[in-house]
UniProtKB/Swiss-Prot annotation:
Its cofactor is heme b. It catalyses: H2O2 + AH2 = A + 2 H2O; 2 H2O2 = O2 + 2 H2O. InterPro entries: Catalase_peroxidase (IPR000763), Haem_peroxidase (IPR002016), Haem_peroxidase_sf (IPR010255), Peroxidases_AS (IPR019794). The lineage of its organism: Bacteria, Pseudomonadati, Pseudomonadota, Gammaproteobacteria, Chromatiales. HAMAP family: Catal_peroxid. Bifunctional enzyme with both catalase and broad-spectrum peroxidase activity. Belongs to the peroxidase family. Peroxidase/catalase subfamily. The gene is katG. This is Catalase-peroxidase. It comes from Halorhodospira halophila (strain DSM 244 / SL1) (Ectothiorhodospira halophila (strain DSM 244 / SL1)). PANTHER family: CATALASE-PEROXIDASE, HYDROPEROXIDASE I, BIFUNCTIONAL CATALASE-PEROXIDASE. It comes from the Bacteria. Binds 1 heme b (iron(II)-protoporphyrin IX) group per dimer.
């Protein structure tokens, strides 16, 4: 039959969807996207179950890798020649644009996963020709194989590039594990086109620049930071300064770090715009198969060397673009600059009456000197009063600039790696930095059973103990490895005053647990978690299950001085579906906020399901509300939530915003009340399938064991000392 196929017909009998077409979310756009909870599992991972990158990378000869990288920097390839014979600027841009996607609001983005290899980031307009940088690195990745991830190599290449040009870097840590497909959880914006202006449909802006939609940091879809030509492509350094400040604040950088990173990033390398942008081919994801994953290929003109087109802006920022020095500030502050356009038609600034010796040479012919350039963002470093003051200090104190930049670069490239306990390798700095959320080591030599007995006799209720432990641990974000129960920061500002933590109830519970912890010689962090375990064990016994909740001592107690209050504000929960609470009404539904929190905590959909069902019957609702407490046996760890939610003896009636009554069909009498977060486990077809499992008569014990396993996972999420 094969030879009878019609020309153009599909030989596959459509047994599986192998191309992207209409998905369930296309057909039902308001459905919960549970896929974000099940990304990056082992199925697409070619390394297999037994592979542990964080153990494998410890075998890496870092010195040998760095030696190879140093050699690569000046080994210009004919297929993509190095500017001035040095790839440093290209490698720094690659590393910068990997790390620079990080945003502090949700901890997502950053260089910790090697996601620059995949769409959409590999094809962003701001990343034109970074595919060439990664291909230049391929021989090194191939050589060191499983001991060196792409994520580590990309950042390391940027670090070595700076070192090769004369900067003393602050340090470097290995340990970034690659993903194998694009993330599904990161919201990059709602725009339907690249570089859509701020007045477009689905804009990320409201009335002013400060209204940039959370959690976004970049000003446009497809940019890493700000538009280098100006706001919406209109040059105005003071307006651009506002964008720069907002964007870098959302990357957890202050003004001094912002100036240092801008200047340090533009001390080396150049922009590329000596040609017609229209001559560039499709981006990597859109390119034909014979392009082998390379994009933006110019098949009309030469398209490499001095004729390369990337951003469209053309020129170097400094006189010596392959040397770390203070030349950026020398040119920026000592010359007047005028607005011009590049050969590609992009807005840029060029100096007026510049001395010939201050001009950089051509990338291919050192006998030719050309004007340096500044972007609108660079001019903001001169025109904005606060940025200008910092720029002048850096100009007058080069050693101070070197130190601030080295530290800011380290922060940029390591922010999403988490605390120092996760650092690997001989170049990992030993200094504790406040943005790492340091936690001192805790004790493990106390009597855990004696401590449990004292907690059990404390008079605290099951709900009080479980809620406090949960609130302490739920701040964990797997996106940037921040938050969690370790450190007991729930007793410190700002967490002790968060509405979601019920400050009055929290103060009472902590007052009891602090004394017990001190008497036992245990940390408060351990005691809070252990109290939650005690509450669960009591509730399980009351339901007829004798179970011990696993516990690993060793958490420490952080001090207020170790806690960056401003940075921790971003970890404040605005809703917690597990405790059936929403701070106020938002544009997104409560169940969507629960899904986002679940993904950040690293939980699966079944784990989310069993935890919600268990928390409801333990009396942990915020403020003691009874919404979703679908049981007559509160305080016992039963599967009643699922049994009653799936029971067709009841109907569900809306009675207000996010409020429902569960009524008996036979009498229409109100039996319970609930919220959307409760009812979604019966209405969403996937979540209902999990709810039915836990409602089954033969799964009462499975429910308890699964709840305890998921609970323990949350309590230990930030225990990096327990894993490789």
């Amino acid at each position: 039959m094969a030879d009878q196929q019609k020309a153009g017909g599909c030989p596959v009998m459509h047994g599986a969807m192998t191309q992207v077409g209409e998905s369930n979310l296309d057909m039902w756009p308001n459905a919960l996207n549970l896929d974000i909870l099940h990304q990056h599992d082992r199925k697409p991972d070619p390394m297999g179950e037994g592979f542990n990158y964080r153990e494998e990378v410890k075998k890496l000869d870092l010195d040998a890798v760095k030696q190879d990288l140093h050699q690569l920097m000046t080994d210009s390839q004919a297929w993509w020649p190095a500017d001035w014979g040095h790839y440093g600027g290209l490698m720094i841009r690659m590393a910068w644009h990997a790390a620079g996607t990080y945003r502090v609001a949700d901890g997502r983005g950053g260089g910790g996963t090697g996601n620059q290899r995949f769409a959409p980031i590999n094809s962003w307009p701001d990343n034109v020709n970074l595919d060439k940088a990664r291909r230049l690195l391929w021989p090194i990745k191939k050589k060191y194989g499983n001991r060196l991830s792409w994520a580590d190599l990309i950042i390391l290449a940027g670090n070595v590039a700076y070192e090769s040009m004369g900067l003393k870097t602050f340090g470097f840590s290995l340990g970034r594990e690659d993903i194998w497909h694009p993330e599904k959880d990161i919201y990059w914006g709602s725009e339907k086109e690249w570089l859509a202006p701020s007045d477009s449909e689905d804009s990320r802006y409201g009335e002013d620049r400060a209204s940039l939609e959370n959690p976004l940091a970049a000003v446009m879809m497809g940019l890493i930071y700000v538009n280098p030509e100006g706001v919406d492509g209109n040059p105005d350094p003071l307006r651009t300064a506002e964008d720069v400040r907002i964007t870098f604040e959302r990357m957890a950088m202050n003004d001094e770090e912002t100036v240092a990173l801008t200047a340090g990033g533009h001390t080396v390398g150049k922009c590329h715009g000596n040609g017609d942008v229209e001559n560039l081919g499709p981006d990597p994801e859109s390119a034909d198969v014979e392009e082998q994953g390379l994009g933006w290929n110019n098949k009309v003109t030469r398209g490499v060397g001095r004729d390369t087109v990337s951003s469209g802006i053309e020129g170097a920022w400094t006189t010596y673009p392959t040397r770390w020095d203070n030349g950026y500030f020398h040119l920026l502050l000592n010359y007047e600059w005028e607005l011009t356009k590049s050969p590609a038609g992009a807005w840029q600034w060029e100096p007026v009456d510049i001395k010939e010796e201050d001009k950089p040479v051509d990338v291919e012919d050192p006998s030719i000197r050309l004007n340096p350039i500044m972007t609108d963002a660079d001019m903001a470093m001169k025109m904005d009063p606060a940025y200008r003051k910092i720029s002048e200090r850096f100009y007058n104190d080069p050693a101070y600039f070197d130190e601030v930049f080295a530290r800011a670069w380290f922060k940029l490239t390591h922010r999403d790696l988490g605390p120092r306990t996760r650092y690997i390798g001989p170049e990992a700095p030993q200094e504790d930095l406040i943005w790492q959320d340091p936690v001192p080591a805790g004790r493990t030599d106390y009597d855990v059973e004696a401590l449990k007995a004292k907690i059990a006799d404390s008079g605290l209720s099951i709900g009080e103990m479980v809620s406090t432990a949960w609130d302490s641990a739920r701040t964990f974000r797997g996106s940037d490895n921040r938050g969690g129960a370790n450190g007991a920061r729930i007793r410190l500002a700002p967490q002790k005053d968060w509405e979601g933590n019920e400050p009055e109830r929290l103060s009472k519970v902590l007052g009891v647990l602090e004394g017990i912890a001190a008497d036992a010689g245990a940390s408060l962090a351990d005691t809070i978690v252990l109290a939650g375990n005690v509450g669960i064990e009591q509730a399980a016994r009351a339901a007829g299950h004798d179970i011990t909740v696993p516990f690993a001592p060793g958490r420490g107690d952080a001090s207020q001085e170790m806690t960056d209050v401003d940075s921790f504000q971003y970890l404040e929960p605005l809703a917690d579906g597990y405790r059936n609470w929403v701070k106020k009404e938002y544009a997104v539904q409560p169940e969507e906020m629960m899904l986002d929190r679940t993904q950040l905590m690293g939980l699966t959909a079944p784990e989310m399901t069993v935890l919600v069902g268990g928390m409801r019957v333990l009396g942990t609702n915020h403020g003691g509300t009874k919404h979703g407490v679908l049981t007559d046996r509160e305080g016992q760890l039963t599967n009643d939530f699922f049994v009653n939610l799936t029971d067709m003896a009841y109907t569900w009636k809306p009675v207000g915003s996010n409020r429902y009554e569960i009524r008996q069909r036979s009498s229409d009498a109100v039996k319970w009340t609930a919220t959307r977060v409760d009812l979604v486990f019966g209405s969403n077809s996937i979540l209902r399938s999990y709810a039915e499992v836990y409602a089954q008569d033969d799964n009462r014990e499975k429910f308890v064991h699964d709840f305890v396993a998921a609970w323990t996972k949350v309590m230990n999420a930030d225990r990096f000392d327990l894993v490789a």
